[in-house]
């Protein structure tokens, strides 16, 4: 099964080379790779041309939302995968996602591969195991030997990359909302748009794995206040969306349901309403 893999990149060529290399050698199927080159001051545009990789370009950093939207215009496959440029896809990552697709009724769902990260960020959805934090000290051999033995169950609450969604639904919800540029909280906003369209399957697939170097580019940009934007747009806090809707980080238990009107939900709703009025 062929995917259209969208990778935004901002002067991060060494990680991008690793990312593309891993997709090419560790995928079970040939995929369409589309890079959005932000600025490209480090030679990224020239390199992707030499590699005959499809790409879109902006002379400045367009931010995640605009970048993935521009790249998605070139997507030809039925399924779009949004992947970060500091990710290393592990063997059969795509085959396992394709198998998962065949088990899900319909095409309205979000799936994520499971990230392995070198240090603990408090994210219950990832596996913590250090195989290097930079391209130059990446222990690829050890990772390939050990990644499949790292313990993790399927988890609920898929919203972040590597994220897979049918192109029909990507287009129906309008891709990523550019009012969230440069991108803080844009993953949750996209998931909430999918929820509003009736999507109730947000599954993190344990056996499909990528190594994530956690190379932060957000420190180089002026951040949008995504939490307040999300609250004003949807009337709930992101923490409510994670806890009551997505059950993020909990063992996967099937399609999600609308949150029951319990006292904790009521209390959080009241606080969210007050915060929205004050913001």
Label for each model-derived stretch:
Residues 91-131:
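Conserved donor NDP-sugar-binding/catalytic core segment of glycosyltransferases
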Residues 80:
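Short aromatic/hydrophobic "clamp" motif used to bind/position activated sugar donors
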């Amino acid at each position: 099964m062929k995917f259209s893999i969208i990778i935004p990149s901002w002067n991060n060529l060494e990680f991008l080379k690793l990312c593309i290399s891993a997709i090419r050698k560790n995928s079970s199927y040939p995929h369409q790779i589309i890079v959005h080159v932000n600025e490209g001051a480090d030679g990224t545009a020239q390199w992707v041309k030499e590699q005959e990789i499809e790409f879109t370009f902006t002379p400045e950093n367009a931010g995640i939302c605009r970048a993935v939207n521009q790249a998605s215009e070139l997507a030809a496959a039925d399924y779009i995968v949004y992947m970060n440029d500091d990710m290393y896809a592990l063997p059969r990552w795509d085959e396992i996602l394709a198998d998962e697709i065949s088990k899900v009724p319909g095409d309205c769902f979000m799936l994520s591969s499971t990230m392995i990260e070198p240090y603990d960020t408090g994210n219950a959805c990832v596996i913590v195991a250090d195989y290097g934090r930079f391209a130059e000290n990446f222990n690829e051999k050890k990772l390939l030997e050990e990644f499949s033995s790292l313990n993790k169950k399927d988890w609920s609450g898929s919203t972040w990359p590597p994220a897979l969604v049918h192109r029909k639904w990507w287009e129906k919800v309008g891709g990523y909302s550019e009012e969230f540029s440069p991108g803080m909280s844009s993953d949750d906003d996209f998931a909430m748009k999918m929820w509003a369209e009736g999507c109730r399957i947000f599954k993190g697939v344990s056996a499909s794995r990528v190594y994530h170097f956690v190379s932060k580019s957000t420190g180089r940009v002026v951040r949008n206040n995504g939490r307040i934007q999300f609250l004003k747009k949807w009337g709930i806090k992101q923490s409510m969306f994670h806890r009551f809707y997505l059950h993020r980080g909990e063992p996967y238990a099937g399609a999600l349901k609308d949150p029951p009107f319990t006292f904790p939900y009521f209390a959080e709703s009241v606080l969210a309403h007050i915060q929205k009025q004050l913001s």
